Amino acid sequence: MAEFVRAQIFGTTFEITSRYSDLQPVGMGAFGLVCSARDQLTNQNVAIKKIMKPFSTPVLAKRTYRELKLLKHLRHENIISLSDIFISPLEDIYFVTELLGTDLHRLLTSRPLEKQFIQYFLYQIMRGLKYVHSAGVVHRDLKPSNILVNENCDLKICDFGLARIQDPQMTGYVSTRYYRAPEIMLTWQKYDVEVDIWSAGCIFAEMLEGKPLFPGKDHVNQFSIITELLGTPPDDVINTIASENTLRFVKSLPKRERQPLASKFKNADEQAVDLLERMLVFDPKKRITASDALAHEYLAPYHDPTDEPVAEEKFDWSFNDADLPVDTWKIMMYSEILDYHNVDASGASAAMGEFNGQ
């Protein structure tokens, strides 16, 4: 049975196995607190994310289960990787991943990025997205703070808690507003992997300019700012809007012409502007794919078609429509954790006590 030690971080109890020491707070998210720590087994620095009260509601339990399944399945150089997972005696879940030191948001707020860094970062983002999308997964919440970077400029996409199956009937607002694709704002109902390409385009623009491209104060203002640059959406896009209120709002806006991005990004080279034009397209089906973006001339210095892998198999989303009680999600979670630790999962419910120190 694992031995647990306790520490207070920002008034929150961190209850971790004795394998980890030197806890330091890194950041606080909506669903958990992240600390850095020293893994005494590997002598490496790691990040430990505490999921707060994962079994308090079926929705939270399912969300945590989804993130765990995704972290186990997605194995790629540009995706954050899971190195350990455990449940504390207080029934909080802890994900342990590699520690990268900083994120793109912090980099962008500290200094302008030079061209070669912008190229290399965008290349790695698109390389990661090619893999994620090939697994049948949409990240949905891509933003600079979810893109981790180390001192060697290695980049990894993190925070897959909101990720969802590729499904033409996806529902709900999810990503941070500045980076949110228009189809999410306009319809709520039909979106796919292309939302990640839009978000990556917004991040690309921010790397080029040093500030957010579409800093909307609210959803109405956000959409208005987008149309000022990209013009009024084409009729075939407008006709996909399911909400009558949204449809009326869009049709009430003044007609605007798309502005050439070269006039906005005067210091960027032609290839950068051309790729950005292909990413920031209203019609999702006309947006460039991650795979095609990697082959674009702008990313030629890094493009290697023999080293841009796709997933070996699609992610299994069969659980995603399930409406289950907390206790069932809990047993499924324990089963996944036992599987991760190469323990026979057939007795997951009986083994629950061992994993929370009972």
Swiss-Prot record:
Q: What is known of its domains?
A: The TXY motif contains the threonine and tyrosine residues whose phosphorylation activates the MAP kinases.
In its UniProt entry, what is this protein called? Mitogen-activated protein kinase HOG1
Task: Offer a single GO CC term for the protein.
Answer: cytoplasm
Instruction: List the active site.
Output: 141 (proton acceptor)
SUPFAM superfamilies annotated for this entry? Protein kinase-like (PK-like)
PTM note? Dually phosphorylated on Thr-171 and Tyr-173, which activates the enzyme. Phosphorylated in response of osmotic stress.
Cofactor needs? Mg(2+)
- Predominant place of localization: cytoplasm
Q: Name one GO biological process term.
A: stress-activated MAPK cascade
- Name positions with the PTM Phosphotyrosine: 173
Q: Which residues carry this modification: Phosphothreonine?
A: 171
Source organism superkingdom: Eukaryota
The record's SMART domains line, in alphabetical order, gives:
S_TKc
Gene3D superfamilies assigned to the protein according to its UniProt record, in alphabetical order: Phosphorylase Kinase, domain 1 (3.30.200.20), Transferase(Phosphotransferase) domain 1 (1.10.510.10)
**Gene name tied to this protein:** HOG1
